């Protein structure tokens, strides 16, 4: 069943001020392959530092990076290739078998169209040894669709972590893989389709309905189903049943990535980037089945929007916005941040990347140098800057 949550649409016509600034310092984590496509984060060795995994789409590699700590974070990071698969679009950490060794799941598009697990070695000393990793496919996903994104999530409250998956055409879908009693038996993972899609960009778990159960918030980029969508979890006892589909808005845009956070000012709960270069802010209205949608045009001299995040860049207590871009050709910037002035119709543009790089991806916000402000981690895949981070100059 689909429930339509009609958005009240407001368009804020504004132009962020353009200021000539130096870009932030860029540090390379890895540029050893081709087509780095998204960074996902977890502390896999329990040292308190965030580690990363990335799929290199053109290079056909899935790699893991162990954080060397703030003193060495500006150098190349210790890394391991955990598997070689064609066209990996996404890679994410998940301890699927619960043995304490954090595995990696890769989602592949192209002609591969399969989801793989890369089993981590149980001995922590072997984590950076590529020959100690084992790669295997989930049979239920083989040659089904172009898999784009994976969200590890305990959907049904049993047998550990399940996998929520999203794809693009052909056969675009969102669904979940149910973990069996022995997660190592990949043939026993069961597929449950939830939603017919066009092109899935984001999958995020968030309790948007307030019932204590994480739902799945997604952006669907293409086709008649495009927009911002909530799949309402029916409860762990009914997880294999029907999930209500709530359409929150954005159908008139090619929506890209999203971020969710309750922000006192300007009052948005969800922010979404769009290919047509608008940031969409969503807030709950007085009516329970209506959301207010606000559109903010992109800053000048940037590519087309890809990922967006809330971040207090300058530590003034107000949440700013940062976004990455594709198609940042020539003198266009691929990363900029918009300073909050306290007025939601007035955002001030600031530089992050400068003109170097063309196609950037998912943004992760972490204090890698431990100086008290948030740095920005991302990938760039056209000029092969690779897996990189930008050092926040605030401190």
Question: What do these predicted regions represent?
Answer:
Residues 1-2:
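N-terminal secretory signal peptides that target proteins for export/translocation
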Residues 20-395:
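Beta-propeller-forming repeat regions
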Residues 6-17:
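Bacterial N-terminal signal peptides
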């Amino acid at each position: 069943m689909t429930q339509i949550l009609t958005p009240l649409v407001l368009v804020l016509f504004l132009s962020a001020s353009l200021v000539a600034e130096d870009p932030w310092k860029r540090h390379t984590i890895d540029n050893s392959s081709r087509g780095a496509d998204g960074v996902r984060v977890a502390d896999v060795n329990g040292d308190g530092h965030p580690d990363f995994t990335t799929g290199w789409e053109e290079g056909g590699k899935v790699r893991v990076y162990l954080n060397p700590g703030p003193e060495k974070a500006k150098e190349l990071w210790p890394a391991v290739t955990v598997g070689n698969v064609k066209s990996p679009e996404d890679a994410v950490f998940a301890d699927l078998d619960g043995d304490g060794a954090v595995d990696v799941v890769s989602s592949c598009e192209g002609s591969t169209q399969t989801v793989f697990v890369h089993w981590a070695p149980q001995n922590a000393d072997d984590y950076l040894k590529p020959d100690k990793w084992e790669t295997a496919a989930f049979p239920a996903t083989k040659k089904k669709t172009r898999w784009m994104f994976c969200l590890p999530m305990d959907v049904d409250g049993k047998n550990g972590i399940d996998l929520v998956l999203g794809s693009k055409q052909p056969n675009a879908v969102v669904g979940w893989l149910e973990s069996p009693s022995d997660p190592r038996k990949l043939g026993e993972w069961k597929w449950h389709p939830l939603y017919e899609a066009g092109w899935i960009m984001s999958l995020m778990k968030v309790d948007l309905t307030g019932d204590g159960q994480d739902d799945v918030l997604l952006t669907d980029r293409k086709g008649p189903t495009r927009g911002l969508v909530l799949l309402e979890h029916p409860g762990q006892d009914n997880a294999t049943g029907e999930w209500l589909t709530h359409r929150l808005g954005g159908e008139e845009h090619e929506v890209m990535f999203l971020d969710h956070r309750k922000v006192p000012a300007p009052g948005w709960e969800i922010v979404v980037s769009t290919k047509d270069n608008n940031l969409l802010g969503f807030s709950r209205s007085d009516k329970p089945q209506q959301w207010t949608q606000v559109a903010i045009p992109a800053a000048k001299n940037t590519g087309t929007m890809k990922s967006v995040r809330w971040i207090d860049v300058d530590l003034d207590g107000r949440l700013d916005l940062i976004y990455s871009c594709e198609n940042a050709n020539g003198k266009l910037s691929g990363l900029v941040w918009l300073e909050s002035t306290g007025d939601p119709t007035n955002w001030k543009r600031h530089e992050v990347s400068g003109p170097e790089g063309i196609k950037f991806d998912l943004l992760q916000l972490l204090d890698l140098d431990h100086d008290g402000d948030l740095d920005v981690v991302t990938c760039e895949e056209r000029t092969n800057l690779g897996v990189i981070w930008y050092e926040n100059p605030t401190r």
